[in-house]
Every structure is written in C-alpha cells, then in structure tokens.
C-alpha cells in the first residue's frame, strides 16, 4: 500500500491521493514522453474525398461520351460544362486520396495531418 500525504500538524491524511517516491537514479525523463502517439485517421475526410473522386470520374466519363457523340447528339454545348465540373470535382478527391494512401503506406513526407478534417 502506498503512503498517503499527511498533515504534519494533525497527523491526518489530507487527501485520498496516493504518493510514491521517485527513484533516485531517475534523470527526469519518462519513456512515454518520447513515444509517438498513433496518427488520428480522418475517416470522414477520406470518405468525402472518395465520394468526390467517384462523382468526378463519373462526370468525366459522361462528358467524354457526350463530346464523342455516343450518348446524344448535343455536341460540345452539353459536354464541355459536364467535363469542367467533372474535372473540378475529381481533382480534390484524387489529391486527398493520394495523400491518404501514401500516409497509410508510411511514405516519407506524407501524413494524415495533411488532410483537412472535420473537427466535431
């Protein structure tokens, strides 16, 4: 049992906190302060990046098929806006998925901290 701290004047323990002496060979450092905590994986941000990637890829494919004339004969007036929106949605999704992949594989220079997270 660990000794509790006592009030010297009355001899009564002043709290329920247990104290113990530090070893005399201790240099003031503990191993826990040097251990790296496991990275916090931003699952919501990765899910959003996946959705953006898939929607963007779908819009790029549809825009390409519209431009080629396989879906309808509308021509470039319908295909170009779909392609532009597809590219604008695809690029952030691809970028963040690439960071998440490299961070999960442990590549140097990539971490989950580079992915913006929803702080909730």
Curated annotation (Swiss-Prot):
It is a multi-pass membrane protein. InterPro entries: TMEM230, TMEM_230/134. The modification Phosphoserine is found at residues 15, 23-24. One of its GO terms (biological process) is synaptic vesicle transport. It is found in: Membrane; Golgi apparatus, trans-Golgi network; Cytoplasmic vesicle, Secretory vesicle, Synaptic vesicle; Early endosome. Keywords: Cytoplasmic vesicle, Endosome, Golgi apparatus, Membrane, Phosphoprotein, Synapse, Transmembrane, Transmembrane helix. The chain crosses the membrane at residues 51-71, 79-99. GO terms for cellular component: autophagosome; early endosome; endomembrane system; late endosome; membrane; recycling endosome; synaptic vesicle; trans-Golgi network. It holds the Pfam family TMEM_230_134. The keyword Plastid does not apply. Belongs to the TMEM134/TMEM230 family. Involved in trafficking and recycling of synaptic vesicles. This is Transmembrane protein 230. It comes from Bos taurus (Bovine). The gene is TMEM230.
